[in-house]
Amino acid sequence: MRIVVTGLVATYPMGGVSWDYLAYVDGFRRLGAEVLYLEDTGGWVYHPQAQTFSDDAAPNLRYLVEALRVIDAPADSWSLRAPDGVQHGLGLDAVARFCRGADLFLNVSGSCWLRDEYRGARRTAYLDTDPGYTQATLSAVAEGCASAEQQFSADLIRQHDRFFTFAEHIGAPDCRVPMGDLAWRPTRQPVVLERWPVHVGPSAARYTTVMSWKPGGAPPVIGGVTYGSKDVEFMRFAALPQRVPVELEVAVGGAVPRGELAAHGWRVVDAYECSTTMAVYQDYLRRSRGEWSVAKQIYVALRSGWFSTRSAVYLASGRPVIVQDTGWSAHYPTGDGLFAFRSLDEAVAALARVEADYAHHCAAARAVAERELAAPRVLERLLREAA
């Protein structure tokens, strides 16, 4: 079996991003597939230290090569098209041959342009990792009010023949993510459990999370309603540190009101410093006591069922996870190692339950990852549905 997996590892050279996309490469290879990692966004790449985009892909290319080594990917199993049009790694002709013979072209996050050279796979699947935003784009086109960027994105989406989404609750009566005219199939983040062994060392005193405060660009609009991001939801729970006897830390990027959060008792650290490489990111999560986090407002308000890729690897590390409910609690077991909350009181109660039997909930967290998120289970289902 031949599979093309796209992603944003070089475009956003940060540890958490790399683990997300390379789990597909690693997971499919472990199922016996021959996998090509392809990255071609048609745009510039991000330089996190400078906090800006650039047409210089040299440091991003070096990062990608190192990231692929972490998962033991063969040297000839990747290709990156830089902003200047140069194809690094596997050349364009070889990429075209691989794509023509592929059983599946999996466009994760819709990150890759579908150039002529990338076509010809038996199935071309779009994987929506940002539910609500994707559907807002499609809705804008349907309503005749799309920007040029939205029109381009919608046209790209419709060039696929299978459609997967992290909106796991889509189609449920209480889910407000519009289905539109596409047959969305729910999926979830795969975790290669062998890469995330249970951390048996001493755990930190702090519950942590890693997040972006507020994305740039225009906010998504669906049905005339404008939706926000994590900044909106986080402030609903700003007083949480004053209600619990444990320390809470947020590793966050963006225009964060650090002083205001610190006044409420939050420990605020820089997200990039916790995610410079895959190893640094993994170590930060594994040294945490567990995760406490909110979701983007659009995920919550639409009852999308989105579940965090980051929470998935906290669980795999044997770290209890307490995260805001987006509708995901209808699809995952809760109450042992994994807790959903909708209100401040529920968040307080969940932290108390974990602290009352911490060792039990650590073991239960890993068990949830093994049952629900193991790469073979997730990816074999995706392959069946893609076929």
Task: Give residue ranges: language-model regions.
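Residues that mark the start of a beta-strand
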Residues: 1-3, 123, 206-208
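Extended catalytic core of nucleotide-activated donor transferases of GT-like folds
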Residues: 4-174, 275-280, 284, 300-302
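Catalytic binding pocket for nucleotide-activated donors in carbohydrate/polymer assembly enzymes
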Residues: 7-23, 29-45, 50, 55, ...
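Hydrophobic anchor at the start of a short beta-strand
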Residues: 33-36, 124, 207, 246-248, ...
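Residues at the C-termini of beta-strands that transition into short coil/loop
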Residues: 39, 128, 164-167, 188, ...
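P-loop/Walker A phosphate-binding loop and immediately adjacent motor/lid segment at beta-alpha junctions
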Residues: 117-132, 179-198, 317-319
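Conserved catalytic-core segment of nucleotide-activated headgroup transferases in glycan assembly
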Residues: 171-290, 298
